[in-house]
A protein has these predicted regions:
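Single conserved hydrophobic/aromatic residue that forms the stacking wall/gate
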Residues: 181-190
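Thiamine diphosphate
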Residues: 1-182
Length: 190
C-alpha cells in the first residue's frame, strides 16, 4: 500500500504554460526544476525561483535583466516550496543523526549549490511560502510575495502593489546582485 496525495491548484487567470523541459519530471515531483538556462558564465548572475502565475513575471524579468543590464539568470519553476522544505528537514535530520557519515545535500542544494549568484524567489502567496526554503540554501536569499492587503483595479496594478511584477523583480535582482559584490556593467539606473 502506497500513500499518495494528489493536489490541484487553481488560479483565476488563464495563461499558456511554457513547454515542459526535457527530463524535468523528477524535479517537478521534488519541488523545482530549471526552466531557463543561463547563457553566459562571464556576466553577473542571479537564480530566479518563480511559482504559479508569477513564473511568467520571472521569465519576463529575466529577459529584461539580460537585454538592458547584462545580468544573466537561470529561472526555476517551483512546483512546491513545501516539498522542498520537507526534503530539507529530512536531509538535515539525517545529517544531524549521522555525524560520522558524509553530509547529504538537500534537493535545493543539489540544484542551486554550484550555481552562481544570489537567489530571488517570488510567489503569488505570502513571502513565508518561499521563505520555507531559506535555511536550506547557503547563498544570499531574497523573497517576494503578496503579504498584506491590496486593492487594485487590475491584476497588473495588484502585482505592482505587492512588488511581484517584472519591474520589481528586476529592481530587486539588481540590488541582490550588487549586494553579493559581483561587478555590474555600467548601465542606466532602474
Amino acid at each position: 500500500h502506497e500513500n499518495i496525495f494528489y493536489y490541484i491548484t487553481t488560479m483565476n487567470e488563464n495563461y499558456s504554460h511554457p513547454e515542459m523541459p526535457k527530463d524535468c519530471e523528477d524535479g517537478i515531483l521534488k519541488g523545482m526544476y530549471k526552466i531557463k538556462e543561463s547563457s553566459s558564465s562571464k556576466e553577473a548572475k542571479i537564480q530566479l525561483l518563480g511559482s504559479g502565475t508569477i513564473l511568467r513575471e520571472m521569465m519576463a524579468a529575466s529577459d529584461i535583466l539580460k537585454k538592458e543590464y547584462q545580468v544573466d539568470s537561470e529561472v526555476w519553476s517551483v512546483t512546491s516550496f513545501n516539498e522542498l522544505r520537507k526534503n530539507g528537514i529530512e536531509v538535515e535530520r539525517q545529517n544531524l543523526l549521522n555525524p560520522s557519515e558524509t553530509n547529504k545535500k538537500s534537493y535545493i542544494e543539489e540544484c542551486l549549490g554550484k550555481q552562481q549568484g544570489p537567489i530571488l524567489a517570488a510567489t503569488d502567496y505570502m513571502r513565508i511560502n518561499a521563505d520555507q526554503i531559506r535555511s536550506f540554501t547557503k547563498k544570499s536569499f531574497y523573497s517576494l510575495g503578496t503579504d498584506g492587503y491590496g486593492r487594485s483595479d487590475t491584476r497588473k496594478n495588484l502585482r505592482s502593489f505587492f512588488e511581484v511584477d517584472k519591474e520589481h523583480i528586476v529592481a530587486y535582482s539588481l540590488s541582490a546582485v550588487s549586494y553579493t559584490h559581483l561587478t555590474l556593467p555600467t548601465t542606466s539606473a532602474v
